[in-house]
Amino acid sequence: MPPPAAVASLTLQVPGGAHDVTSLATSPRTMAVPGTTEQLTIFYSGSMVKFDNVPREKIRYACRLRRLYSSLQRSLQTQDTSMFPSSSSLHIQTKRRGYSVIRLLREMLMVCSSTRTKPMLVHSDSIGAQRTGTPPSRRRIHARGKSRSCQEMSHCW
């Protein structure tokens, strides 16, 4: 077994200020106390949090949870993903779904006016339909070769 390496002084930046790790390790507050309690040190997001007088059972339980979480992560990463669609096919499905949503919105945004103004498709790249002499209840709206009467579109409002 190789001899233990020399302890180097390491300064950590924590929200409370800079702390020297070697002085923390040798201070009476951080020394392991024989008995049923120990100190728990957690390194999270670049900071170090210490808890004194933590029962050993809770520390063991926390270690088991950490091991369980890491093994679960590893198993999910190595799982066979052939049954899941690839990201490229998801992108294509999203595009198709987006197209159908746009078509649906275009159809739903057709406006039949009860006044004498001409009905039009509310969209930037559309041209308003021609006004006819028929009453608004029977007027047809033409969009992309399809025609619908105002009564047929009443379910959209």
Curated annotation (Swiss-Prot):
The keyword Endoplasmic reticulum does not apply. Pfam families: tify. GO terms for cellular component: nucleus. Residues 137-147 have a biased composition (Basic residues). Induction: By abscisic acid (ABA), wounding, and drought and salt stresses. Down-regulated by cold stress. Keywords: Jasmonic acid signaling pathway, Transcription, Transcription regulation, Ubl conjugation. One of its GO terms (biological process) is regulation of defense response. Ubiquitinated. Targeted for degradation by the SCF(COI1) E3 ubiquitin ligase-proteasome pathway during jasmonate signaling. It comes from the Eukaryota. InterPro entries: Tify_dom (IPR010399). Transmembrane segments: none annotated. Residues 126-147 are annotated as: Disordered. PROSITE patterns: TIFY. Belongs to the TIFY/JAZ family. Repressor of jasmonate responses. This is Protein TIFY 8. It comes from Oryza sativa subsp. japonica (Rice). The lineage of its organism: Eukaryota, Viridiplantae, Streptophyta, Embryophyta, Tracheophyta. The gene is TIFY8.
